[in-house]
Curated annotation (Swiss-Prot):
Active site positions: K16, D141
Organism for this UniProt entry: Burkholderia lata (strain ATCC 17760 / DSM 23089 / LMG 22485 / NCIMB 9086 / R18194 / 383)
Coiled coil: none
Descriptive protein name: 4-diphosphocytidyl-2-C-methyl-D-erythritol kinase
Recorded name of the encoding gene: ispE
Functional description taken from the UniProt entry: Catalyzes the phosphorylation of the position 2 hydroxy group of 4-diphosphocytidyl-2C-methyl-D-erythritol.
Family of the protein in this entry: Belongs to the GHMP kinase family. IspE subfamily.
UniProt EC number: 2.7.1.148
Length: 293
């Protein structure tokens, strides 16, 4: 990433995985109480920011299917601008890498990277806690990316505690299907009463290689998604025949963990023709973590 007074380029917006995802309740407002562990990956979209002197926020690259005014990146920049009253503007370029509707947090991560990068580019120096409070207004996953560490998450995903995770390589396979999160959350067959676990429960097993990630918990959304989307079910079955695998978020991506890049790439090489798979290393910290204190 280059850093100057006029631009910040090559800012990674990393993907996340849900190593497990339990739904423990439903609130009167319709939101669900969750428990999960979020894992950052060294793989994601890349954003570039160039200072404007006219105060305008502009997305200068087209993102198919996402109008500029509703793009979380633009909304994040305008939210930060309104909150601080800065006279600065910005041109934002987005190199999309992560598939949308995949459970990888792509849009949320883009928004968080925007908040962090503009905190530096606009010389705002807002503390991390203040950025996280703003991030909640953009979506439940955005505060995690501002938090910037692998985390045990509770509530609707905004209650975060740092967890230390071992370095692993992941193969992430994404079927060619978009899974609407709201559709899965509203399904009457979705489990909403999973027993609560503790961070101690998770940490007691997370260093074990036996059956990981199946050695702890599950993704409560996976059964509903695979019953509705045959493509996701097919990927889960294929990957599980290679090594224990699990869906992330509300899908559609499915992941498996490996001890080495070589093992992950060997599995990737066996993917059926036409399947989209990416190999990525785990991260312990967001690449822009230092942009907030």
């Amino acid at each position: 990433m280059t850093d100057s007074t006029r631009s910040l380029r090559n800012c990674l917006a990393p993907a996340k995985l849900n190593l497990f995802l339990h739904i423990t309740g439903r609130r009167p407002n319709g939101y669900h109480d969750l428990q999960s562990v979020f894992q950052l990956l060294n793989w994601g979209d890349t954003l570039h920011f160039t200072l404007r002197d006219d105060g305008r926020v502009a997305r200068v690259t087209d993102v198919p299917g996402v109008p500029e005014e509703s793009d979380l990146v633009v909304r994040a920049a305008n939210l930060l601008k309104a909150h601080t009253g800065t006279a600065h503007g910005v041109d934002i370029e987005i190199d999309k890498c992560l598939p949308m509707g995949a459970g990888l947090g792509g849009g949320s991560s883009d928004a968080a990277t925007t908040l962090l990068a503009l905190n530096r580019l606009w010389q705002l120096d807002l503390p991390r806690a203040e950025l996280q409070s703003l991030a909640v207004k953009l979506g439940a996953d955005v505060p995690f990316f501002i938090f910037g560490k692998n985390a045990f998450a509770e509530g609707i995903g905004e209650e975060l505690a740092e967890v230390q995770l071992p370095t692993r390589w992941f193969l992430v396979v994404t079927p060619r299907v978009h899974v609407p999160t709201a559709e899965i959350f509203s399904d009457e067959l979705l489990t909403r009463d999973s027993k609560r676990v503790t961070i101690t429960d998770f940490l007691a097993q997370q260093n074990s290689d036996a059956g990981w990630p199946d050695s702890f918990g599950r993704n409560d959304m996976q059964q509903v998604v695979t019953s509705k989307y045959a493509e996701v079910a097919q990927v889960v079955k294929w990957l599980y025949d290679v090594t224990p695998a699990r869906m992330t978020g509300s899908g559609a991506s499915v992941f498996a963990a490996f001890r080495s890049k070589h093992e992950a790439e060997a599995a990737q090489a066996k993917l059926p023709t036409g399947w989209n798979g990416a190999v990525a290393e785990s991260l312990n910290e967001h690449p822009l973590f230092a942009f907030a204190s």
